[in-house]
Amino acid sequence: MPVVWPTLLDLSRDECKRILRKLELEAYAGVISALRAQGDLTKEKKDLLGELSKVLSISTERHRAEVRRAVNDERLTTIAHNMSGPNSSSEWSIEGRRLVPLMPRLVPQTAFTVTANAVANAAIQHNASLPVPAETGSKEVVCYSYTSTTSTPTSTPVPSGSIATVKSPRPASPASNVVVLPSGSTVYVKSVSCSDEDEKPRKRRRTNSSSSSPVVLKEVPKAVVPVSKTITVPVSGSPKMSNIMQSIANSLPPHMSPVKITFTKPSTQTTNTTTQKVIIVTTSPSSTFVPNILSKSHNYAAVTKLVPTSVIASTTQKPPVVITASQSSLVSNSSSGSSSSTPSPIPNTVAVTAVVSSTPSVVMSTVAQGVSTSAIKMASTRLPSPKSLVSAPTQILAQFPKQHQQSPKQQLYQVQQQTQQQVAQPSPVSHQQQPQQSPLPPGIKPTIQIKQESGVKIITQQVQPSKILPKPVTATLPTSSNSPIMVVSSNGAIMTTKLVTTPTGTQATYTRPTVSPSIGRMAATPGAATYVKTTSGSIITVVPKSLATLGGKIISSNIVSGTTTKITTIPMTSKPNVIVVQKTTGKGTTIQGLPGKNVVTTLLNAGGEKTIQTVPTGAKPAILTATRPITKMIVTQPKGIGSTVQPAAKIIPTKIVYGQQGKTQVLIKPKPVTFQATVVSEQTRQLVTETLQQASRVAEAGNSSIQEGKEEPQNYTDSSSSSTESSQSSQDSQPVVHVIASRRQDWSEHEIAMETSPTIIYQDVSSESQSATSTIKALLELQQTTVKEKLESKPRQPTIDLSQMAVPIQMTQEKRHSPESPSIAVVESELVAEYITTERTDEGTEVAFPLLVSHRSQPQQPSQPQRTLLQHVAQSQTATQTSVVVKSIPASSPGAITHIMQQALSSHTAFTKHSEELGTEEGEVEEMDTLDPQTGLFYRSALTQSQSAKQQKLSQPPLEQTQLQVKTLQCFQTKQKQTIHLQADQLQHKLPQMPQLSIRHQKLTPLQQEQAQPKPDVQHTQHPMVAKDRQLPTLMAQPPQTVVQVLAVKTTQQLPKLQQAPNQPKIYVQPQTPQSQMSLPASSEKQTASQVEQPIITQGSSVTKITFEGRQPPTVTKITGGSSVPKLTSPVTSISPIQASEKTAVSDILKMSLMEAQIDTNVEHMIVDPPKKALATSMLTGEAGSLPSTHMVVAGMANSTPQQQKCRESCSSPSTVGSSLTTRKIDPPAVPATGQFMRIQNVGQKKAEESPAEIIIQAIPQYAIPCHSSSNVVVEPSGLLELNNFTSQQLDDEETAMEQDIDSSTEDGTEPSPSQSSAERS
C-alpha cells in the first residue's frame, strides 16, 4: 500500500524523549486505573505492576502516587464496587501509602485568608443547598443542544418572534423547551412551567453548571459570534429547566466562550409570565462559571419576568443577543455593543441570558424571544465597549418585555447608562414573555433585570454592573468597570446610565428612574422620561414618571463622582421597588443611596401615554420600537459604537451630549415608549437634587418603572459635563426604577445601556465635534426610523434636554444667524428626538443638536448642518406640535422641569419646525445679532423674528395658548443662572408635549383654556407647570401658542429675587401684539383673559417654571445669576393674574432651583462663557419667537452674579419678580411695540460682567400653524392624553425630570443654553 504520508516526522530527540515519557506515564496510569476498576489489588496484579514499573521506568513514589490517585477516584471506586463488591480498596490503600508520612502543617495565614474563608464558607453553604450529587445524576435533561428547529438563529431579528415572543406561547412545543444557541441550534430544555403567561411569577430553578460568580452569559464582551453567541432560551414551565441549561451549556459549541445555560431547579424560582422561561445562558471563558451563579438561593422571579418579556438584542458591537452574565463579560453581548447590534440580526428568539452566580451573584438575563411587535432595543444593553459588557458581574441583562403587560410595572427600565440593568419587576414583566427579544418594540417592554436573592444583582443588558433589586431578588453581575452596569452597583463596574455606553461608565440604576443599563426603556419616549444632568455630570438621577406611577419608593443615592454607581433596590415584589443607586465609575467610587430618601408619591399615568412604534429594526443603529407596553429602553452606545448598537432597536429620540471630557454622548430618546415614572414628586425631586449635588460629577439617567402600564414621557438625565450617561429613560415596568448614572468619560468606554422595553438608544459618540456630526447623522437615521414613534413619544418629547437647547446656542456661537435657528433647533432637537416618529431626518438633526449642546466647542462644526437639520425638523414638525423646553443643569429638581421642558420642547418642536423655516431666515438675520459679552446673550437686531414671535404670541395668548413657561433651573455650578431659556413654545407644536403637561396640570387646563391662569397659579403655586401644561394643551387647540420656558440658574437666596425679577427685569420683550392678534384673531379675544392670567411659575426642588399664558412674547427672560433666582420676566404680553400665587410658585420653584443650583455648582466648570451662552439663548429665544407660536429659549449662563440676577434680571425681591411677571403679562400690548426683541438681562453672580449687557430675545417669526399645532397636540397626545390625566404632582414630576435634564445640560455648559454655546464661541 503506497505511503500517503511521511513515515518520519521532524521531531528532535528531546521531543521524542518527552513524548515517550508521556506515553509511559499514561500507560502506567491507565493500567493502574484498569486494575483498580477490576477490584482490589491481588498478588498477580502487584507483580504485574512491579514488572511494568521497571519496563516503563516508574519510580516507587510515582507508583504510590498513581495508586493513591486510583484509590481516591470515585469513578473507579464506583466501578469496582459494582463489579467486585464492597471493600475492594483496602489492599490498594495499603499499596498507596506514603513511605514518609506528610508532616502536619500549620494553616497558612495570609492577607487573603479571610476572603478565602468567606468564599469557602459561601461555597459550602451554596453546595449544601444543592441536591446530593447522586440525586443529580439521573436528571431528565433532554439536550438537543444543537437542534435548530425551534428558533431562528438568535442573530435573526426579533421580527420572527415566534420562539422569542414573550407572552406569546412558545413557537412550537419544542420551542418552549428549546434554548437556541448562538449557533442557531436550539436546545430543548424542560423547565418548570410558568404559572402564568402574563403576570404570574413563575418559579424555576436554575442549576449552575459552572462555578458561582457572575452569571448569565458571560459572553465574550466582544461577542465574537454575533449570531451564534446569543442563546435564546424560550423556556417552558418545566421543572427540568436547570438540567437543560446544564446540558445546553455543556453542548454549546465552543465557538462562544463556553456558553452555559443553567437553570437551577431548586435554587431559584423565577416568576415568568406564562410560557416564558428563563434560561441562564452564560458564555464565559470558563464553562464552570455558570453553575455556581445559578443557585437555588436566588429568586429569579424577577429574572424570569425579565426573561420572558425581554429579548436580548446583542448590543451594537456584536450581533449576539446573549446577555453576558459573567462578571466581566456577562453583559457583554447584551449590553455593550453586542446586544445593541444584535437585535437587528437576531431573530425573535434571542438568547435569554440569565446567569445566576452563586447565591449572591446570581444574575439572570432573559431575552424575550421575539415579539416582533415589541420594540427591540438592543435587547441587551449596549456597552460602550466589549469590556463594558464584561465590566461587572452585576451586569446581567435581565429584560422584561413589557410587551404584553402594558402596565408600567411590567415595563422595567433597564438602566441605560451603565448596564442598563433592569430592576426586575416582579411578576408583571417577568410573566410576560421571557424570550421576548429586546428588539420587539411594541408589545414587549423588554427589560433585562437580574435578581438575586442574597447577593445577586440584576443587571440589565447594560454593561456596567449595577444592582437592581427587583422584587426580593436582584442579580448582580460584575461588569468590567468599563461597561456601565445596570442597576446594581458592581464592584468597580460602572452602571450604564442613560447611554449604555456612557452608562457603562457608571452604574446608573437606582430606585429613582435610574436606568443604568442601556436596555432599560429602549423604546421609551423621551418625553416622559426625566433625565437630570449634573454639571459635575457624574451622576444623573432621574425619576421617571413610571416610577412615580408605581408609587415605589425611590431612594435617592448620593452619587459620588465615581464612574460606577451602585444602585441598590429594595425590591417590593409587586410594589414599587426602592432602588438606591450608587455610582462608581470604573474608578470604583460608590455612592450610597439613602434608602427611602426619595419616595415617589405621585403616580403618573404613563400608560398609553406614548408607545414606541415598531420601526424596522436593522438599518438604523439602535432603532428600537416598542409599543406602549414595552418598557422604555435606553441604549447607550460606546462613543464609537453608537450607531452599531442600535441596528435592531428603534430609537426614537436621540440625544447627543458632549461630555465635558470631550466625549460625546448621543442620547436617543424614543418617545413612543412609555416612560412611566418620568418625574417624581417635588419632594423626590429635591432628594434627587441632593443626590445630584453629592454626585455633581455624576450624571445618572434614572428610569423608574411605573406599575401602571401607562407610558409616561421619559426623562433623560444627561450630564453634559461628566461622561454621564447621556440618556436615561424610565420604563414603566414592575415597580422598578432604574437610574442610570455614568460618567461621560466612562461612557465612551462602556456605556451602553439599553432598557429592554423602550427603544431608547443613547450613543456615546466621540466628544469631538466631528463625532458630534457623525452622531447627529446616526441620530438622524435613528430618528428617521423613529419618526413613527414620534406621535407616541409625545409624552417623552417633554423630556428635552437643555443640551439640545444648548445645541442651538452652540450654533449661535458658530454663527450669529445660525444660533438663532439652532436655538429653535435645540428645542426641536429634543422634540425631534422625542418626535422622531414624525420627522426622522429632522429629528435626527435635533438629536444632533443635543450633542452640540453638550459640547459647546464641538457644536461649532456641526452647528451649520444641525441648523439645517433643525430647519428640516421645523418643517417636518410644522405639522407636528413641539414644545421646546430648556433645561438647566440643576441635577435633582430638574426632573420635573426637565419633563415640563421636554413637553414644552415637544410642543415647541412643531413651532420650531415652523420657526425652523423662519430660523433659516433668521440664520441670516442672526449674523446681525450682537453677542453681549457680559450677559452672554445675543441681542437680536432683527425685529421680524421678534415680531413674528410676538404675533404668534399675541395670537396665542387669547387662546391662552401663549404660555411662557419659565423654568428657572439653577445652574449654580455652571453659574448658568444667568442662562434662561426663554422658550416661547408654540403651544400648537407644544400640544403634543402639552398633553404631558396637561396631564400634570389637567385641572388647570380648563381654567387656563377658559381664562383662569391665575387660578392655576393659585392652585399650583408649587406646580405652576401643571397649569402651564394644561394651558399648553389648551393652546394646542389653538395654533398660536407661545410657551416660554425660562430656565434660570438661581440660588435659594435668589428665590425672592425671582419673584421680584419681573419688575426689575431689563428684559425688553417686544412682542408684536398686533401681529399676534393678526395671526390669531380668535386668540385675541382670549388675549385679555390671558393677560389677566398670570404666568404660572412652577417651583421644583431646583426648578422654577413660569408659565405665561395669554399673549406673551415667548421671552421670559431673565437669566439669573448663580445666587439670585432667575428672574422670569415674561414679555410685556405676559398676563399677571395672580402675583401672589405666582410668587409662591416661584418661591417653591426657586427653592427647588436653589437645590438644583447647588447641585449644579459642579456643572459650573462646563460653562465657561455664560454671557455668550446667554446671548445664544437669546438668539434661540428669538428664533422661537419668530414663529407664531414661538417657543423662546433664552439661556443665560450663570456667569452673572446672583446680585446681578437680582438687580438686572429680577427685582430686588422675589415679590418684585412676581410683580414683574404680572407687569409683563399685563403689558402684552406694550410688548408688541418692542415685539421684535426680548431683552433679557442677566443679573447674577457675574453681575459686573453681565449687568451692562442686556439680552434681547427676538422671537423668530414662526409660521403660525393654528390648526397644525392643535392637531399635532391632538395627535401627539396619545401618550400625552394620559399625561393630561396626571395629577399636577405628576406634571411637576415631569417638570422635575425636565429640570434635571436641563441641569444636566447646564453641567455640560454647552448643552444648557445657546447662551453658553455663544459664550464659548466668543
Curated annotation (Swiss-Prot):
Post-translational modification as stated in the protein's UniProt record: O-glycosylated during cytokinesis at sites identical or close to phosphorylation sites, this interferes with the phosphorylation status.
Region feature (Disordered): 148-178, 192-215, 417-444, 698-736, 1205-1231, 1290-1322
Region annotation Interaction with ZMYND11: where it falls in the sequence: 104-108
One Gene Ontology term, aspect cellular component: nucleoplasm
GO molecular function terms listed in the Swiss-Prot or TrEMBL record: identical protein binding
Subunit and partners: Homodimer. Interacts with the transactivation domain of BRCA2. Interacts with CBX1 (via chromoshadow domain). Interacts with ZMYND11. Does not interact with CBX3 or CBX5. Component of a nuclear receptor-mediated transcription complex composed of at least ZNF335, CCAR2 and EMSY; the complex stimulates the transcription of nuclear receptor target genes such as SOX9 and HOXA1. Within the complex interacts with CCAR2 and ZNF335.
Record protein name field: BRCA2-interacting transcriptional repressor EMSY
